A protein has these predicted regions:
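Short, internal active-site loops enriched in acidic
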Residues: 1, 216-219
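Short, hinge-like loop/turn segments at secondary-structure boundaries
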Residues: 53-56, 103-107
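A short helix-breaking turn/cap at a secondary-structure junction
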Residues: 106-199, 206, 217
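Gly/Ser-rich catalytic/binding loops embedded in alpha/beta enzyme cores
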Residues: 1-93, 173, 199-201, 206
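Structural signature of FAD isoalloxazine-binding scaffolds in flavoprotein oxidoreductases
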Residues: 97-102
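Activation segment
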Residues: 87-88, 187, 212
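Generic structural signal for helix capping and beta-alpha/helix-loop junctions
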Residues: 43-45, 95-96, 187, 220
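General small-molecule cofactor/ligand-binding pocket signal
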Residues: 36, 209-214
Length: 220
């Protein structure tokens, strides 16, 4: 409320009106969060890199010649630069996960309806609000807060007082995990493949059942 939300676009009037908080922001205020900034994004989230005509290029704090990814690249860059401990992102096709992986922070795309959204956009059934943080523990805490119900979103999941910090010590032993480093068709840089395979082996060492499995997508 009161802060322009321009979606990285020159087509939105910054004068507003900006009359109410989104559900996730309302929940954060109720829990005493201090909100001190908004971050950059490519226009309407349609890029996997951090650039737009409105704000220019957002750079990766670890290497200023590199991108922080997108579309929530401003959030990931701010976290990586230690400008704050928590951020909110939106993810349809990777817009939390891509920048989190490129800047070394933690981000998760919750399932549909987990975090209430309002107003709903045209892609609301695919694009979900989620936490971006410096640690898994902070992400669990943030997700617990922003997943609390909001009457404005009729697609929200049934709320059962979930506390996502309860699962932090459960481990992954016995879980079945499928992963695909190339989606069954993509060319993957050998260095990226090496890192992904090493991560899979870590889960195996922790007792998970890990299987490489292509999802059956056709090459777009």
């Amino acid at each position: 409320k009161g802060w322009p939300t321009l979606n990285g676009s020159l087509t939105i009037d910054p004068k507003g009106p900006w009359e109410e908080d989104a559900p996730c922001v309302a929940r954060l205020r109720e829990h005493g969060a201090v909100i001190f900034g908004k971050t950059t994004m490519p226009e309407f989230g349609w890029k996997g890199v951090g650039e737009c005509e409105l704000t220019g290029i957002t750079r990766n704090p670890w290497n200023l010649d590199k991108t922080p990814g997108g579309s929530s690249g401003g959030a990931s860059a701010a976290l990586a630069a230690r400008m704050g401990p928590l951020a909110i992102g939106g993810d349809g096709g990777g817009s939390i996960r891509i920048p989190s992986s490129l800047t070394g922070v933690f981000g998760i795309k919750p399932n549909f309806g987990r975090v209430p959204m309002y107003p709903a956009g045209a892609l609301a059934n695919m694009t979900h609000v989620g936490p971006m943080t410096l640690t898994v523990e902070d992400a669990a805490l943030l997700l617990t807060a922003i997943s609390e119900p909001d009457y404005r979103d009729w697609t929200r999941l049934v709320y059962n007082n979930e506390d996502f910090t309860d699962g932090l010590d459960k481990g992954v032993a016995g879980l079945r995990i499928a992963y695909s480093p190339d989606l069954g068709y993509a060319n993957v840089d050998p260095s990226v493949r090496k890192v992904v395979d090493a991560a899979a082996k870590v889960f195996e060492s922790l007792g998970a059942n890990v299987e490489e499995k292509a999802p059956g997508f056709e090459n777009p």
